[in-house]
Swiss-Prot record:
Source species of the chain: Candida glabrata (strain ATCC 2001 / BCRC 20586 / JCM 3761 / NBRC 0622 / NRRL Y-65 / CBS 138) (Yeast)
Entry EC number(s): 2.4.1.132, 2.4.1.257
Location of this chain's protein in the cell: Endoplasmic reticulum membrane
Pfam family, one: Glycos_transf_1
UniProt pathway: Protein modification; protein glycosylation
CDD domains assigned to the protein according to its UniProt record, in alphabetical order: GT4_ALG2-like
Membrane topology: Single-pass membrane protein
Similarity remark: Belongs to the glycosyltransferase group 1 family.
The protein, known as: Alpha-1,3/1,6-mannosyltransferase ALG2
Amino acid sequence: MVPAKKLKIAFVHPDLGIGGAERLVVDAALGLQEAGHEVIIYTSHCDKTHCFEEVKNGTLKVEVFGDFLPTDLGKRFFIVFANLRQLYLTAKVVLSGRSKDKDVFIIDQLSTCVPFFKLANNKVLFYCHFPDQLLAIRTNWIKSLYRIPFDLLEQFTMYCSDEVVVNSNFTKSMYKKTFKYLQKNPNVIYPCVDTDTETLINDRDMQIGNLLVGKCPNFYLSINRYERKKNIELAIQAFAKASVENTNLVVCGGYDPRIHENVQYLQELTCLCKELDLSYTVNHYSDFIEDSYSVNEIEKLFGAKVIFLTSISSSLKEFLIQNMQLLLYTPSYEHFGIVPLEAMKYGKPVLAVNNGGPVETVVSYQKEDNEKSTTGWLRSADADEWASALIESKEVLNQNPELFKNNGPKRVIELFSRKAMTQEFETNIKLALRHTSNISIIYVVSIIFAVLLKVFVF
């Protein structure tokens, strides 16, 4: 079921940059717009030099309110100022009359504004990527105490929504454990991936990619930010234990030399390679683009068993995914995880940890049982188990190179395409429009008072 009429839909998002949450908002807005609805995004910040192309080129209508307000005070009180900026945005939208003709507001990340839109008689659908309080760092009792009012307000402001949705069943389970006072049972709307496989690879990336494939025709690929929680060492340890002949490991991902953890973790990974007697090279993508290396020098850098690449372009990432043997997706308890879908859409198999989001995206191989639907392997985060899976994957691919070619794309189109996501949004929007609130005006006003007290006192 979908809404019977075309709707006026507004998104509210704190910072319209280039992160995963922003990609979801842009995809949802595009999908609903393509379905004939009138869509606008309200945000507190949007840098046209640091945003997705659909925002930059005007395909999506975006209005910014409150960008003049600070985001912190001396690198502190980020949550306070995030709430303050959203309250300013909300006031501008409501008091200017922009909210009057909107059929529904889709709000994500911060729920502070929800009771204000409800007081203005708007319908609200809240998209919960993950409970914010579970992401907050609490290094001491002062910070823990500081977070209490924000944690409570997250729960009670979200409760004012007409409908709440989450990005995976894993997030749904965490939602239920975290928001114990909420009676809402959220539906799941999976993020989508671009199903277009005719990606244009730029000339320099094509040259770099061909040089790598020429030296390493059979390689496993790991794509993650250089952060310890991504557990990249699991891929390296399993690769060393499996000792699959004529195979290399390419590790690439986000890296900022200004971030201490990025630098330190990459050093730890190279030390691990030394301990495991694996040759390695570290290659910074920016050096390739600036022509700091000749073709011959680049080719030499790709002669090691383990090849580290930092902050590669989307173009080169697409090339590597298209040409890899297997994706090694190492993080545990990922809220969702989009990279496995990026591999599956090209018909490439995935080896992932058997918890969190990948349990919902990857269909684990079972011999003579699910060969028409399998998209890879799911194993516990144990190097021995992963090594066994690598050996098995080599055998399976040697026997049936085309096994995953159709399974991955079919699953992505059915469950994780923009069309599928749009249909789910339309279904849940209809539920929000039909929802008859049993929340009293006294409750809403009380929550608004608490929000204002929280922001201006804490």
